[in-house]
Amino acid sequence: VKNLPYSSTRVAAFLTVFLAYLFAAVPGVALAEPTAPTAGGIEIEPVAGLRAQHVAMRERLANNDFKRPLVLDSFHNSQDVRGEIYAVVPDAFGVFSEALAKPQAWCDILNLHLNTKYCRVAVAKGATSLVMNVGNKVEQPLKDSFRLVFSWNVATNTAEYQRIILSADAGPLSTHNYRITLEAIPLTTGGTFVHLSYSYGYGITGRLAMLAYFSTSGRAKVGFTVIGKNAQGATTYVDGIRGLAERNTMRYYLAIEAYLGALTLPPRVQFEKRINDWFAATERYPRQLHEVEQRDYLSMKRNENKRQ
């Protein structure tokens, strides 16, 4: 994998690749990592905090444009962006937490994304990492992609609460503090309440790259949050950096669902089930998530799977 400094050609190519993929981060001075709700200024412990979120979001979970129990929010300032999903999945908490407490599961999940070219689990001195390559939304050699290494940690895994954190200090073009966090609790109805948070920070180079991206190939791309109506009465959606965060947060959430949905099948057919289900799920939201045709996506992922 090539390293900095980047040529102008690589930077130009990167604008349409990595900015469509950016992962997760939280700088210390801007958007803080989501914390548990508070009562009287006292922080509620994680299980109670997530249960409080579930209660507070009941109306939004029951009535939303997704027509399913799912809430998507995004936040942005001059240095950071974060996307968050709260959702109810039918899987029992025990099944959910056991499946996602394995690092290989996360490589299987992340590999569903268009821009993931490679993911392998690495263990050294007791620490687990996910060694990834990201690149174009079409097939490409690994030597032309970008290497990212994420630490993977099961922070908490009990019968009442699960918290998994993926993080990386730095990425290309001054992107930094990548972070993706998954929290989950069991529900009395038998399902699982899930919170997925995805964030990253960027410096001047990254900011300029994003400005270029959003003025060219990313100009027409939008997220899911409705911000109003245009002069013709059509719905308008958030765009720019928040739209980017919302699209990728949804892609990763749908990848988790696709992974879980294949677990009951024999191992030899799970990969095909995952890639077909993930593509079908993204096509439910073509305005936001359609990028390539199904045959091209499936062919690319099958070929990429051979080199994992």
Residue ranges and their predicted role:
Residues 1-10:
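N-terminal secretory signal peptides that target proteins for export/translocation
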Residues 12-26:
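Bacterial N-terminal signal peptides
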Residues 26-32:
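Sec/Tat signal peptide C-region and signal peptidase I cleavage site
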Residues 33-65, 71, 76, 169-171, ...:
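Terminal "cap-and-tail" regions of soluble proteins that handle hydrophobic small molecules
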Residues 72-99, 120, 240-244:
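Terminal, regulation- and interaction-focused segments at domain boundaries
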Residues 80, 159-161, 175-177, 187-193:
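Coil-to-beta-strand transition motifs
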Residues 89-115:
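Amphipathic alpha-helical segments
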Residues 115-179, 201, 259, 282, ...:
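Glycine-rich portal/gate segments that line the openings of hydrophobic small-molecule binding cavities
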